[in-house]
Design a protein with these regions (language model features):
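Small-residue-enriched flexible segments
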Residues: 2-62, 67-69, 75, 80-157, ...
Length: 430
């Protein structure tokens, strides 16, 4: 008997993009998995499953993917542990779960996507002074339905998860920028734990796999990630240029013809601050480090032009300051203050701007610093609620990190205190 011809409407429905999410807690990993899989019953086969688990489940991490893969179907699996997790429950409302055992799962059907999962040993990386090809070879060819040579005119996106105990993460980030210029790279450093294995998940078989180093997925073809990076600070004072610096120590700043030590420059700024702001300077002062040495920006330039870094020391003899970043002469810098109100204002502005540029994403991923959450916002679900103001009904998943991987000024950095958003959108949208 001849086979039945394909039913066009059924084929179209099967290949339509979709996103399903689940968020559940439980004393045991079995309880959490059972709740998640009940919520995702009938979801169908996904192209990519993202799994984020609280560090409370660290000792059971080797069993997590096998338990999920017995009940859920996906071509690729990726995830990690976190100090907390972000997810969207059966009520359709996203939540941030800190310091409690919780499991978040996001299933994605991405027709036309080229997906290339990868695992990288960060202790054995190519030479940054060598050619780019060894760095590109760290990400193997994909096996997706749309497998082709990647379009050189359309950079891919890279989702990157790092293990907190693995060396060489900063070098890897630089190497990926070297190998894939123009590609958006987003993710975070997983949560720490005392179990004797890694914090990362990568598994395309029923066995699953716990990894250290770095795992991730290259996303190309019909889909891409768009980044929104909220560093949680607001600038105080003018933009300065670095006149003298040694490694990570800033010795002298200039503004026009005037030259001062960093401490003298800060003292001149303090005069114009309120008593509350001067008190904040005592414990919440940072330095924004510009990502271009060309053309001094105006004082009201967007904050995303600067990478916010910790001030780690002051030399009272000469007024120099040490920064948690290598500084070069000619670089632009600006002092910054961090507080909950500033963080919310900045995040709201950036998310609303993103909403005005793109249609509703299929899903959002949040990689948030452990220093955010309730401690920063003084309320539950601080970051995800801001996102829902800009993107109503958006499914969100993610994790609280020990460092966030995200671009600023076209360069990928390892951040702290940051909310790094990855929005999954179809290619061809503005």
């Amino acid at each position: 008997m001849a086979g039945l011809p394909p039913i066009p409407w059924l084929a179209r429905r099967d290949r339509a993009p979709w996103c399903r999410t689940a968020l559940a807690g439980g004393v045991s990993i079995e309880d959490a998995v059972a709740s998640v899989t009940r919520a995702l019953l009938g979801a169908g086969t996904a192209d990519l499953a993202l799994v984020f688990a609280s560090a409370s489940y660290a000792s059971d991490l080797p069993r997590l993917l096998p338990l999920l893969q017995r009940r859920l179907r996906s071509r690729h699996w990726l995830g990690c542990l976190g100090g907390g997790v972000v997810g969207t429950g059966s009520d359709g409302i996203p939540h941030e779960r800190e310091q409690e055992p919780t499991l978040s799962v996001l299933l994605l059907r991405l027709p036309g996507a080229e997906l290339r999962p990868f695992a990288i040993d960060t202790a054995d990386l190519p030479d940054l002074d060598g050619p780019a090809e060894p760095w590109r070879a760290l990400i193997p060819p994909g096996d997706g339905e749309a497998r082709t040579e990647l379009d050189p005119t359309t950079p891919p996106s890279l989702l990157v998860l790092g293990d907190p105990a693995s060396p060489g993460l900063a070098d890897l980030i630089s190497g990926l920028d070297y190998a894939w210029p123009g590609a958006v790279k987003l993710g975070g450093v997983a949560g720490q734990h005392a179990a004797g294995h890694g914090s990362l998940l990568l598994g395309d078989t029923e066995q699953g796999s716990v990894r250290s180093g770095v795992v991730g997925c290259l996303i190309a073809g019909a889909w891409r990630l768009e980044a929104v990076v909220a560093q949680g600070c607001r600038p105080i004072g003018p933009v300065f240029e670095v006149e003298q610096a040694q490694r990570n120590v800033v010795l002298q700043l200039s503004r026009g013809a005037q030259r001062n030590s960093p401490v003298s420059a800060l003292q001149s700024i303090l005069v114009g601050l309120s008593p509350e702001e001067r008190e904040q300077v005592r414990h919440s002062l940072f330095l924004g480090v510009g990502q271009s040495s060309f053309d001094l920006p105006s004082d009201d330039d967007p904050l995303e032009a600067f990478v916010v870094r910790n001030l780690i020391g002051v030399d009272p003899r000469n007024g120099a300051v040490a920064v948690a970043e290598r500084i070069r002469v000619g670089q632009k810098v600006q002092f910054q203050l961090r507080d909950g109100a500033s963080s919310r204002q900045e995040a709201r502005q950036l998310l609303n701007r993103q909403a005005g540029r793109t249609p509703q994403p299929l899903a959002g991923l949040l990689f948030a610093c452990l220093g955010r959450g309730q401690g920063l916002h003084q309320r539950d679900d601080g970051d995800v609620s801001l996102c829902r103001e800009a993107f109503a009904d958006l499914p969100i998943a993610g994790v609280f990190c020990n460092g966030e991987i995200a671009p600023i000024g076209g360069i990928t950095h390892l951040h702290g205190y940051t909310a790094a958003w990855a929005f999954l959108v179809p290619c061809g949208t503005p």
